[in-house]
Regions:
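Bacterial N-terminal signal peptides that target proteins for export
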Residues: 1-9
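C-terminal segment of classical bacterial N-terminal signal peptides
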Residues: 14-22
Length: 326
């Protein structure tokens, strides 16, 4: 059975379960981070063509996505950082946050002839501006330029949490926005902006979601807590996601997983929706989230450079959709 046929069958069943005849006239608005944008747009196009609700998706930073939910200007949002308790308290309608997929965060670089393997201390020294020449990393001498996110980003939050976990020498703290050293560094907006900046500039290196690596931008192998050097891929990132323990709000992280074979920098991606006050859009919102968590949709995640959820985490995510109410 084709994916489109499976999706059509799924939405037919969801329509019956929700007591409605179809979702064809349902239109939902969403915003979210750039990391999974291609995946979500692909999902939403298939949903609409298979009898599901139509969903618009605009790429913004994680802070902007969460702010849109707080301001109640969207039906749901997508973030690569969970909402903090102080922000959850600002949403009177309540929030459900549901892990949908995961991602590795790579050290992407453009330095031909260099097969880069970084210890955890080197990761920290690089990102804090203490390495400025490629010869310090065992490569041919040349100026090194650090590329960082200019926008407020969950990727930056997850990345800096890992840097802090890697070494007590990390001096910049953690968060979605960091004051990076200005020397030998340039800023770029979004994962795509970081990828473009690295690709255009020989000698550049920065952090970005694995799904945005392309062209001349390669991923460094990073030392994990077990002492192994792992490149970011489906297998090594999936092992790292297993180390994440979710709390009662389904938030969680593992900034330096100890599992053998695990890539050391990963994050989850969450859908943030309202617990109540969804009105006539309730069935469509539930159907959209049920679709994202379906085996059919999850089977497409890896094709776009992200990490599908394994059975244990799916078993925690799927029941939460039922908390979304009118």
């Amino acid at each position: 059975m084709s994916f489109a046929r499976q999706a059509l069958t799924l939405f037919s069943l969801l329509a019956v379960a929700n007591g409605v005849s179809a979702f064809a006239e349902s239109s939902l608005t969403s915003v979210g981070v750039s990391l999974p944008a291609r995946l979500y747009r692909n999902w939403f196009a298939q949903m609409a063509s298979s009898g599901g609700p139509e969903v618009s998706y605009r790429s913004v930073g994680s802070a902007s996505a969460q702010w849109a939910l707080i301001r109640q200007t969207v039906d749901f949002a997508v973030s690569d950082a969970p909402m903090q308790p102080k922000d959850l308290a600002k949403v009177r309608r309540g929030v459900v946050q549901i892990p949908i997929a995961g991602s590795a965060i790579a050290f992407g670089y453009n330095q031909p002839g260099c097969d880069l393997k970084l210890t955890q201390l080197q990761d920290v020294q690089l990102a804090s501006g203490r390495i400025t020449d490629w010869k310090q990393l065992g490569c041919e001498s040349g100026s090194l330029t650090w590329v960082y996110r200019s926008d407020v980003s969950g990727i930056t939050d997850a990345f800096t949490q890992s840097m802090q976990a890697f070494s007590s020498q990390w001096p910049l703290g953690t968060g979605a926005s960091i004051r990076w050293p200005a020397d030998h560094a340039i800023a770029a907006e979004g994962n795509s902006g970081v990828a473009a900046a690295i690709e255009k500039r020989r000698g550049a290196i920065g952090y970005l979601g694995l799904s945005h690596l392309s062209g001349s931008v390669r991923a460094a192998a990073l030392q994990n807590k077990a002492g192994e050097f792992q490149r970011p891929n489906l297998i090594s990132a999936a092992k790292a996601l297993k180390a994440i323990e979710l709390d009662f709000n389904l938030a969680g992280s593992s900034p330096n997983p100890s599992l053998e074979g695990a890539y050391p920098i990963v994050t989850l991606i969450w859908v943030l929706a309202y617990r109540s006050g969804n009105g006539e859009n309730t069935p469509a919102i539930r159907a959209a989230l049920d679709f994202m968590l379906s085996s059919q949709a999850q089977s497409q995640v890896a094709e776009l450079g992200l990490i599908p959820l394994e059975a244990e985490m799916l078993s925690k995510s799927r029941p939460v959709v039922e908390r979304i109410a009118q």
